[in-house]
């Protein structure tokens, strides 16, 4: 495993075709892990971290960072600051950490955890598991998203943002979505058409039907 070390200033670090350990340190850094299974630390500053090919682990650290796993089954940890996390391809794990973060799973069956702050979570394609954590979180769903599960939805605090006319359905209001729910044990399953579903864990269907605006927004 090769080791690359940045300095206190703004660095551009490029990994090899092997598995690299990259420590950017201070400054606003650009890092591309290249091939291999890389371990990347952005540390201080507002960093741009790209995993490249392979199953990579990226830590943003301090600052407002952008992390993109690219190919492979990657783990992304935002850390402090308002971070942007993109899993891209593969079955990825995304942790927002502190701050108001954007988490986008991309393709594959992903796990997204927002952490502290008001986060935006979009599982993307595949069957994803999402948890917003603390704060007022927004869960985004477009067509073709697969069968997703939200573990910690809180009515009146979090919101489900659904695309208008998702998958060709006649959906233009929260009331339209409330008519497409089913209670399955202690959970609610929302039918989003074309085989796509959204499962809300420990949620009551009667409350959704009585207060759809506390759950859904349509864009």
Predicted features, each with a name:
Residues 1-2, 175-219:
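Low-complexity acidic/polar repeat-biased segments
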Residues 3-5, 10-14, 19-174:
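Acidic, glycine-rich calcium-binding repeat modules characteristic of RTX/beta-roll
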């Amino acid at each position: 495993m090769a080791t690359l070390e940045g300095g206190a200033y703004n660095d551009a670090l490029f990994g090899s075709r092997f598995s690299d350990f990259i420590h950017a340190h201070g400054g606003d850094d650009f890092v591309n892990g290249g091939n291999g299974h890389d371990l990347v630390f952005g540390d201080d500053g507002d960093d741009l971290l790209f995993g490249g090919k392979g199953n990579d682990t990226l830590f943003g650290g301090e600052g407002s960072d952008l992390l993109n796993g690219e190919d492979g089954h990657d783990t992304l940890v935002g850390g402090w600051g308002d971070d942007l996390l993109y899993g891209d391809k593969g079955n990825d794990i995304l942790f927002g950490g502190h701050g108001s973060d954007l988490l986008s799973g991309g393709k594959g069956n992903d796990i997204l955890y927002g952490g502290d702050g008001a986060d935006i979570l979009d599982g993307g394609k595949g069957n994803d598991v999402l948890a917003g954590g603390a704060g007022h979180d927004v869960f985004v769903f477009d067509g073709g998203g697969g069968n997703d599960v939200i573990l910690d939805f809180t009515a009146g605090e979090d919101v489900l943002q659904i695309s208008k006319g998702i998958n060709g359905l006649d959906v233009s209001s929260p009331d339209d979505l409330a008519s497409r729910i089913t209670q399955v044990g202690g959970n609610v399953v929302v039918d989003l058409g074309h085989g796509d579903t959204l499962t809300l864990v420990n949620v009551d269907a009667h409350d959704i039907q009585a207060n759809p605006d506390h759950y859904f927004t349509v864009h």
